[in-house]
């Protein structure tokens, strides 16, 4: 069965796409899924994280990464799709051609949003591409405080715009950055911590959405 493809996209830089891709990939790989990562962001942060991980852990049966752009993108995506259960695409913030290809290939699009007006406003172009391509999309509140008026306002504004939010949100936790610095996931560095618990719930929720 071809892989289900999760494209992580957001027009605004610094929304946490790369961290999200890496952390979800580790969580799913540890659960026995064959996970492929496709890094199409010219910045190459996901590839740098993976190189650090590979240097420390060596080859892993359930986790691979390919970096591609331009004409190679479709070919590499087909290869990953054929050999994995799940493929995660880390997309660039502003390269419209690559983003469109990643969106069209997706089973589901995940749009991370930090609780700020700028992130909220930046979601519109990505969601519009998803609507035009008729690909389901979910928004995720990322680096969010546990509660507060701003978070409530952003939730309300997203709902009023017809945007579907994931039930799970991710807190603003240093554990994510610490794990990335080690080339690992929070499910490995702090498996009983709050960050790992949030990631596990999010991974379960997304996998259910990807199944349809």
Can you describe what each PLM-predicted range is?
Residues 20:
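Hydrophobic positions on the alpha1 helix immediately C-terminal to the Walker A/P-loop
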Residues 37, 89, 111, 139-141:
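Structural beta-sheet core signal
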Residues 96-117:
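Inter-motif core of Ras-like GTPase G domains
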Residues 186-212:
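NTP-binding/hydrolysis catalytic cores, primarily Walker-type P-loop NTPases
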């Amino acid at each position: 069965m071809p892989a289900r493809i999760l494209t992580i996209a957001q027009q605004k830089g610094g929304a946490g796409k790369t961290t999200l891709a890496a952390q979800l990939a580790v969580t799913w790989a540890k659960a026995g899924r064959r996970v492929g990562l496709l890094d199409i962001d010219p910045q190459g942060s996901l590839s740098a994280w993976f190189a650090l991980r590979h240097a420390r852990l060596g080859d892993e049966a359930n986790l691979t990464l390919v970096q591609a752009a331009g004409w190679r993108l479709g070919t590499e995506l087909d290869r990953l799709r054929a050999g994995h259960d799940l493929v995660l695409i880390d997309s660039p913030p502003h390269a419209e051609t690559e983003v469109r290809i990643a969106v069209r290939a997706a089973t589901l699009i995940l749009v991370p949003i930090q609780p700020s007006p700028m992130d909220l406003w930046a979601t519109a172009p990505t969601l519009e591409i998803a609507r035009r391509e008729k690909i389901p999309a979910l928004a995720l509140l990322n680096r969010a405080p546990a509660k507060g008026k701003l978070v409530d306002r952003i939730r309300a504004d997203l709902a009023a715009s017809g945007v579907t939010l994931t039930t799970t949100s991710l807190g603003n936790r240093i554990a994510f950055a610490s794990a990335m610095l080690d080339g690992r996931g929070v499910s490995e560095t702090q498996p009983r911590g709050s960050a790992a618990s949030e990631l596990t719930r999010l991974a379960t929720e997304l996998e259910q959405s990807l199944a349809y």
